[in-house]
Amino acid sequence: MIDTVKPLRSDAQRTAAAILQAAERVLRHDPTASLEQIAAAAGVTRTTLHRRFASRQVLIAALQASAIEHFYDAFEAASPETAPPPVALHRLTVNVMRTKSNWGYALGILSEDDPAVITKRRTVLARLEVLFQRAQHDGLIAPDVNLDWAQRMYRAMVDEAVKDLEPAVSPQGVADTRANEAELDRLATLILRTLLSGIG
């Protein structure tokens, strides 16, 4: 179950964020890694980690909650209800690929039965549906195309593209976990050109 947490001071927020980013890197490389390894990767002591996350279960729950928020923010930043559909589709594709690449471990272990996951999933899928409806209305998608099918194809293409973006990071986070922005832009353009040329 993913719980909400109390707001933190800015310095505490930075520390918590560093720990969560380190947890993503370390656990992606080794899901059995210890809290000591995560603390070391974050550049904090085990005591500091425990002060913020009392147990491994609490840390994992916070990591999942953070990943969900990043995924939701990826949709929010694309303005799917208001931006011109071509712009929103490109923004959304880049944002979602970036989030899936940077938070792949946490997103991969989300429980499909968690109410928070269910709610956020329904919300983002509804927003994606609105965007595809707008794209069809504007002529980007042919009027006889089934939008449910089109969205499934889109999501499958994004997931395939992300596989090539997965960063090979060491537990110490030596490699940069951020996907290359130019490559994200290239892949988003390729995905949308391929998709829309088939259903447009």
Residue ranges of predicted features:
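Basic, helix-initiating cap at the start of DNA-binding domains
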Residues: 1-29, 33-41, 58-61, 66
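Amphipathic alpha-helical interaction segments
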Residues: 18, 37, 58, 87-91, ...
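Short hydrophobic/aromatic patch on the recognition helix
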Residues: 43-53
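C-terminal peripheral helix-coil segments that are non-catalytic and often amphipathic
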Residues: 1-3, 122, 126, 130-138, ...
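Hydrophobic alpha-helical connector segments
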Residues: 62, 69, 73-101, 112-121, ...
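A short secondary-structure junction motif
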Residues: 26, 70, 96-103, 131, ...
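Secondary-structure edge/capping motif, primarily at the C-terminal ends of alpha-helices
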Residues: 78, 104-111, 161-173
